[in-house]
Amino acid sequence: MCVYKSNSNNSNPSFIFERTVQEASSNDLFLQPPVSASNTSHSSRSNSFYNLQTISPIPISGSEVRTPSLRKNSNNVSSPLDNVIPTSRSASNSTTSSLAHQEYILNPICNMQNHHHRRRTLENSVAPALDASCSIVNDENTDLSDVDMVYSRRPSSAVSLNMALLARTNSATLPSSESSPASPDLKLSRSHSHSAATRPTLNNINNTGMTTTTSNGEPNSRILRFYSYVDMLNDEKLAQANNTPTSRPPMKSQAYSCPFILKRSPPQAYSSSSATTTFSNPFIKTTELPATSPYVSPQQSARQYSNNANNNAKSPKNRSSSILFQRQSILSNVDPVANMHKNPKFQIESSDSEEEDLTMDMLDPSFPLSSSLRSSANLASNPELATQTPLSTSSSYTAIGKPMPLSTDPSYVSSSNTLSSEHELRVEKVSEVLKKKVSNGGFSTEFNSCDT
């Protein structure tokens, strides 16, 4: 199949690749006046050399006479048209063209029609798609926005790319595709690749069918468009601005919406109670409970149990003080105002003397400064008043209305009067404190007998 293109003057049809060459050669050969014999060889050589340099090599029979002088002259011949139209043939074509030139010199008139026939035969080997593409590219009025690349019906790489990208859109987003006729060809439109109005979105992807369908149910041509990552982000921003849901969730919620991550997330998450009991600092206080809650936290109960075990292992005299510490911890949990001024206490243990342990156990900041000083001064001067003071202190506790979960024995309450604040000056002696503790514990008679 040969594709022709008419000239501007519509005189003679010419070939696309040899349009200018054929016009020049035909005019020179058929309109040339008769010349002398000496100039015939030079003129025919110049014309045939220009003609045959743009044509594929033509085989010549072996019976032809080949002389080295003619081959040498034909290589050195130059025509004025060589400066007008540049040739892109290699140097090897000059040798083959010289062989055809010798055949043309032997019979210039008879071989003219044979050259046309051979050129048409060679022209049939050119692909029609390449021929049409060259005609479109050479046209000055061609607009690239109106050019479509039409592929064959066989499975090509473009179809595989279309299946990989899943960029098949519905005609609802492409109003121009409704007017196009239905064809199975795959088209790549350059005009709509950069426009945001006809850009395909992820909501309109057809994952199953190879061809898209219009609103009327008719199959439409498959369209493959360039859809970059920037276009996807822009579509997501537009969807978020318009409050329209997208098929792909955002990056933050995608990690939580995946079922694989949801299956592994519970072992990695820790509850607040297990975290506080396992990795908590024992010297930092936890959040205070309300006044009506008698709950004791596990940290405080563990600390109280360890303090009681240490005190009871040292001497049996510290049992009352350990019970007082439990009572004070419960009262401190109930009264949040007193805990605001309370600092964390550290117990220093030593085996040299037992007096330091007793003084550390006597500290109680929950009582006022004046009442503790008054009670300590009265007990230091008159040890006999130790049995009378529990009445007033117990009445003061009942007036406040605080719960007493341990016991209502006056001996425990009376021993608490001997405790002083952290910020006051100690005026009592160790012997007096021991005498008071023993008398309150029921061993007053034995202690007095030992003194006498």
UniProtKB/Swiss-Prot annotation:
Which keywords accompany this UniProt record?
Answer: Cytoplasm, Phosphoprotein
Q: Where in the cell is it found?
A: Cytoplasm
As stated in the Swiss-Prot or TrEMBL entry, residues carrying the post-translational modification Phosphotyrosine are 227, 295
Q: Please give the residue positions where the record annotates the modification Phosphothreonine.
A: 121, 169, 173
GO terms for biological process, alphabetical:
establishment or maintenance of actin cytoskeleton polarity
Which GO CC annotations does the UniProt entry carry?
cytoplasm; cytosol
Where in the sequence does UniProt note compositional bias of the Polar residues kind?
64-81, 171-182, 384-398
In residue numbers, the region (Disordered) covers 61-94, 171-220, 290-321, 348-402
Family label: To yeast VHS2.
Q: What is this protein called?
A: Protein MLF3
Species, as recorded? Saccharomyces cerevisiae (strain ATCC 204508 / S288c) (Baker's yeast)
